[in-house]
Amino acid sequence: MSKNLLIELGLEELPAYVVTPSEKQLGERLATFLTENRLSFEDIQTFSTPRRLAVRVSGLAAQQTDLTEDFKGPAKKIALDADGNFSKAAQGFVRGKGLTTDAIEFREVKGEEYVYVTKHEAGKPAKEVLLGVTEVLSAMTFPVSMHWANNSFEYIRPVHTLTVLLDDEALDLDFLDIHSGRVSRGHRFLGKETTITSADSYEDDLRSQFVIADAKERQEMIVEQIKTLEVEQGVQVDIDEDLLNEVLNLVEFPTAFMGSFEAKYLDVPEEVLVTSMKNHQRYFVVRDQEGRLMPNFVSVRNGNDQAIENVIKGNEKVLVARLEDGEFFWREDQKLQIADLVAKLTNVTFHEKIGSLAEHMDRTRVIAASLAKEANLSAEEEAAVDRAAQIYKFDLLTGMVGEFDELQGIMGEKYALLSGEDAAVATAIREHYLPDAAGGALPETKVGAVLALADKLDTLLSFFSVGLIPSGSNDPYALRRATQGIVRILDHFGWRIPMDKLVDSLYDLSFDSLAYTNKADVMNFIRARVDKMMGKAAPKDIREAILASSTFVVPEMLAVAEALVKASHTENYKPAVESLSRAFNLAEKADASVHVDPSLFENEQENTLFAAIQGLTLAGSAAQQLEQVFVLSPVINDFFDNTMVMAEDQALKNNRLAILSDLVSKAKTIAAFNQLNTK
């Protein structure tokens, strides 16, 4: 008869960002534990609040399945001595399996007999196996851990309770400094300690103490309550998904409410108000039916609606203090001069090993000028890039950005416009931070994109030059994100700028502030980001073939990846790749100093292939270029069928290898086809 298992770990308040991943991890680790211990189950449901992580297993087998395993030992000639008795090797083998030599049998494997034993292990009761479930809790990993009291161990937060129930039976075990029981803690203010009656009664037992254990249910409650407020007040609430996920992990019993603030604060830029509400106070933004910001907010209380008016007033008071700061900085910052702020950037450190922000901007300006030409910007756009590069970090010294650092770039755009800067310059100041997250929005203007590329390139080269290179998962300066941004921007705008030549040109630049070094590491790092971009859809062999090509133009590489993936599902892919691979492998033996001499051709196939190569222009899209190469497959095969490439005559051999080298030279601009797998 199957059973239901409940495990709940009661902790001190968890950071909101840890709750959901930890809930998922607990479920996955327990599933692995049960599977490895031969305990079958029907379903696993996980629970979490800021003060608990829990999991319930339904339909858990009452006993492990029996285990029968065959073990292969030494060969028979080693297992038996000259008298036919079992040797020490055979005896040691069976002893290690907990058996005797009586269990030995011989089985033939590839013409030779070997010792085999079969071990039967009866399944243990689930209750006995589950005493080891603390291994699951101990194996949990967290981004941060802590000590408490005088304990030597670490965990995400102090543990207060552990409940492990098999149906309604409490299992007896210890974890850290806690002994298991069936007592759980209710809501910190509204509830009290409560007894969990059984695995099935878990949610109801906690609900009676004002705890909604199911995160999905809490989320549904929050959304439903907000929707009710929308209808009652005739407004629209921005239910930001990230904020919603954070808020539901801050509360155990949610109650949404609406507060307000004076309309005068609406004169402050919307981004300031939204940042104050969303990022600093965890409030949802309220708009009218036309989408205009309203002097209201929605927050979620961790509790019921008792004394809710006092709660609303308290939240309003806290928000007004934030808005007062924003209004003050908005007013005072407009008195500042951009030129004065830029001059002060010489005293702001970019990084202690690299220099000041002003020096970073100087290098960025030079790189931006080069990129603007590579991207074929107009003279007007080039001028905008140059002006933006001179001032684009000035807002870091404004009071607003000092208080709300999330607004860097955003306030720079607004202050630049107020100071009379060109709109393209102002937009570039905002856009140079983009993309600011994996998959985040990209710059929309060419001027902003060029400035973003230049800023990210100098950042990458500067940090690598002083040895601050990411390793493993450690990337404190977000260089992977910056480089991924470079790749995405180049692809988005379709700029066919050869990255290898571009980086070479940057290393030729001379700056008093810093000398770029570690070029090989930089190139490998950029290749890894391109590889990651292709990895979303392309298998490893296709990615490696493209990265080994003679072209390092990001949009083309990504387009070739897509074209090769599509082509790999067609009938002519395998024969085409195989013929090209053969050509690539032989071409490696070619003498680079030898050029094709048609007078040495001995058959029509040499003439035909050479003419086809001469006419190969590789024009059009990546798919079209790929087709232009693939269509040569019959010609290549005909050449191989009728021509001895590695002829004894050295001149003939070198000439034929030179033909293949010419083919490879052109085809390799697409991919190194001998890296592709056709098996």
Curated annotation (Swiss-Prot):
<dbReference type="GO" id="GO:0005829">
    <property type="term" value="C:cytosol"/>
</dbReference>
<keyword id="KW-0648">Protein biosynthesis</keyword>
<protein>
    <recommendedName>
        <fullName>Glycine--tRNA ligase beta subunit</fullName>
        <ecNumber>6.1.1.14</ecNumber>
    </recommendedName>
</protein>
<dbReference type="GO" id="GO:0005524">
    <property type="term" value="F:ATP binding"/>
</dbReference>
<dbReference type="GO" id="GO:0006426">
    <property type="term" value="P:glycyl-tRNA aminoacylation"/>
</dbReference>
<dbReference type="InterPro" id="IPR015944">
    <property type="entry name" value="Gly-tRNA-synth_bsu"/>
</dbReference>
<keyword id="KW-0067">ATP-binding</keyword>
<comment type="similarity">
    <text>Belongs to the class-II aminoacyl-tRNA synthetase family.</text>
</comment>
<dbReference type="Pfam" id="PF02092">
    <property type="entry name" value="tRNA_synt_2f"/>
</dbReference>
<keyword id="KW-0030">Aminoacyl-tRNA synthetase</keyword>
<keyword id="KW-0547">Nucleotide-binding</keyword>
<dbReference type="InterPro" id="IPR006194">
    <property type="entry name" value="Gly-tRNA-synth_heterodimer"/>
</dbReference>
<keyword id="KW-0963">Cytoplasm</keyword>
<dbReference type="GO" id="GO:0004820">
    <property type="term" value="F:glycine-tRNA ligase activity"/>
</dbReference>
<keyword id="KW-0436">Ligase</keyword>
<comment type="subunit">
    <text>Tetramer of two alpha and two beta subunits.</text>
</comment>
